[in-house]
Amino acid sequence: MKILRKNHPLLKIVNHSFIDLPTPSNISSWWNFGSLLGMCLMIQILTGLFLAMHYTSDTTTAFSSVAHICRDVNYGWLIRYLHANGASMFFICLFIHVGRGIYYGSYTLSETWNIGIILFLTTMATAFVGYVLPWGQMSFWGATVITNLLSAIPYIGNTLVEWIWGGFSVDKATLTRFFAFHFILPFIITAFALVHLLFLHETGSNNPSGLNSDSDKIPFHPYYTTKDLLGIFLLLLVLMILALFFPDILGDPDNFTPANPLNTPAHIKPEWYFLFAYAILRSIPNKLGGVLALVLSILILAAFPLLNTSKQHGLIFRPITQVIYWIFIXNLLVLTWIGGQPVEYPXTMIGQIASITYFAIIIILIPVSNTIENNIIKL
């Protein structure tokens, strides 16, 4: 068996990626989230496949087909809630994975990091088009508001919006194409995830100390396979608790009402994992400025490798930047909270302050603290 896995053309790839892969001996549980994201992706594809067997992407029947899945399909309610809450678990793991990458300086592996940003954007696009499919009030109005943002693009904006809608409003054509996008995008994510792994295995994993670990590596199996299994069991436990005890806690009550173009909900907001970006969008009074800030709130992650001037790898021995990092995390939580609040004082003002802080930390404070820490080392 050992000879087969080392020589067989297909098994050799698996062997070099998951069995004999030399891995730093000191990587902590923060490194588990890559495998957890893979697990989340598999859960989403499987549950999504079974949902697609019963769902109809037609404006007249979409809402009732989701109700039919929950009422009449064997364990349909479980599949639906695993899929809905699985998306939330996916984004929790994704945020932690990116946060770990920033804290431990994994952005220095620039190809892996940039593919990761593409993965992040593709996952956000998948979640957005998926949220439209149940055709509830928030699905419809969320789709209308977010797609309408493209009209801010000079000259081609309005044409682009009508092209995406397939008409002059969000309607049957929009729902059908969003279903098609939602079905195909997870497979594109899977392909990008493999490229992400390919680039990672070219350079080898980073580690918590930020030091070179070439002299202290151990095989991935059995050490990290068992460690990942523990993480997967814990993830499944949390997901099952969410799906079985609190299935609608992260959803929006407006989505229990079928989509009605003549009745606008009091507060239109996306799913919780987009609220930080939505708060940044709303904090700028100008429409085009808001859209640019929304896009930059994700693309600014690409600035981390470019703005990095530190002589040390990661934040483990850098107390000043550590403080700034945790302010950044708290600021993100504030943005998430503000994104779900009505557009009125003082929420608008807090949103504007938090949005300025978000960009200032990445562009100004972290590079300045890097320079200060570099000078302290020289003393």
Swiss-Prot record:
Where a ubiquinone is bound, by residue? H201
Q: Read off the InterPro entries from this record.
A: Cyt_b/b6_C, Cyt_b/b6_C_sf, Cyt_b/b6_N, Cytb/b6-like_sf, Cytochrome_b, Cytochrome_b_C_euk/bac, Cytochrome_b_N_euk/bac, Di-haem_cyt_TM
Q: Does the keyword Transport apply?
A: yes
Does the keyword Nucleus feature in the UniProt annotation? no
Q: Where in the cell is it found?
A: Mitochondrion inner membrane
Q: What family is this protein classified in?
A: Belongs to the cytochrome b family.
- Biological role: Component of the ubiquinol-cytochrome c reductase complex (complex III or cytochrome b-c1 complex) that is part of the mitochondrial respiratory chain. The b-c1 complex mediates electron transfer from ubiquinol to cytochrome c. Contributes to the generation of a proton gradient across the mitochondrial membrane that is then used for ATP synthesis.
Instruction: Share any extra remarks.
Output: Heme 1 (or BL or b562) is low-potential and absorbs at about 562 nm, and heme 2 (or BH or b566) is high-potential and absorbs at about 566 nm.
Q: What protein is this chain from?
A: Cytochrome b
Q: Which organism is it from?
A: Akodon boliviensis (Bolivian grass mouse)
Which gene produces this protein? MT-CYB
